[in-house]
C-alpha cells in the first residue's frame, strides 16, 4: 500500500563496505595511512589521476595555495586601522578567503599522500619565511626599526 499514498519505500542505508566498493571501481581503496605514489585523488574525484605530469601540477597547486594562505595571514590586509565599513568588509573578505584556502589544504592533506603533505608543509614554510620571519625584513640603518610587511 506504500505506492497508493504517494510515498516510496525508504531506500536501504548503504553498507559500510559499499563506500569501499565504490572507491575500488574508481581506482582503488581510499588510503587511511600515509602512502607515497602518484596515483591518488586530491580534492576532486579523479584528480590528479594516474598521470605523473598531473600529479606534479597537483603538488604545485597545493604548494601555491598554502603559501598564499600564509601570505594572507601575515600581510597587512588584516591589520587594524581606522574604523570604517569598507575596511571591515575587506578584512572579512580576506579572512574568509584565507580560511577557505586553509581548509582546502587540510582536505588535500587528508588524501594521505606523502607528496601532498610535503608540498603543503613546504608551501606554509616558505610562505612564513617570506612573509612572517625575520629572514627578509629590511632594517633601517638610522632607527633600527623593522619593516613589518613584505607585501
From Swiss-Prot:
* InterPro entries assigned: Cop_transporter (IPR007274)
* Keywords tagged on the record: Copper, Copper transport, Ion transport, Membrane, Transmembrane, Transmembrane helix, Transport
For this protein, the parts annotated as crossing the membrane are: 52-72, 103-123
Its induction note reads: No change in expression levels after treatment with high concentrations of copper.
How does the protein associate with the membrane?
Multi-pass membrane protein
Tissues with expression: Highly expressed in stems and at lower levels in leaves and flowers.
Where does it reside?
Membrane
Does the record carry Transmembrane as a key word? yes
Q: Is Transmembrane helix given among the entry's keywords?
A: yes
GO cellular component terms, alphabetically, are: membrane
Q: What is its main location?
A: membrane
Judging by the UniProt lineage, the source's domain of life is Eukaryota
Q: Name one GO molecular function term.
A: copper ion transmembrane transporter activity
Give the protein's function.
Involved in the transport of copper.
Family named by the database record: Belongs to the copper transporter (Ctr) (TC 1.A.56) family. SLC31A subfamily.
Q: What is this protein called?
A: Copper transporter 3
Gene source species: Arabidopsis thaliana (Mouse-ear cress)
High-level lineage? Eukaryota, Viridiplantae, Streptophyta, Embryophyta, Tracheophyta
Amino acid at each position: 500500500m506504500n505506492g497508493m499514498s504517494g510515498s516510496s519505500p525508504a531506500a536501504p542505508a548503504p553498507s559500510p563496505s559499499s563506500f569501499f566498493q565504490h572507491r575500488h571501481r574508481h581506482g582503488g581503496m581510499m588510503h587511511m595511512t600515509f602512502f607515497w605514489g602518484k596515483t591518488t585523488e586530491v580534492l576532486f574525484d579523479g584528480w590528479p589521476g594516474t598521470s605523473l605530469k598531473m600529479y606534479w601540477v597537483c603538488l604545485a597547486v597545493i604548494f601555491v595555495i598554502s603559501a598564499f594562505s600564509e601570505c594572507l595571514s601575515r600581510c597587512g590586509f588584516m591589520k587594524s586601522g581606522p574604523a570604517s565599513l569598507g575596511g571591515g568588509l575587506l578584512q572579512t573578505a580576506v579572512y574568509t578567503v584565507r580560511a577557505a584556502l586553509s581548509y582546502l589544504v587540510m582536505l588535500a592533506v587528508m588524501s594521505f599522500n606523502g607528496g601532498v603533505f610535503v608540498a603543503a608543509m613546504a608551501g606554509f614554510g616558505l610562505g612564513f619565511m617570506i612573509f612572517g620571519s625575520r629572514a627578509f625584513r629590511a632594517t633601517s640603518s638610522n632607527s633600527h626599526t623593522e619593516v613589518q610587511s613584505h607585501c
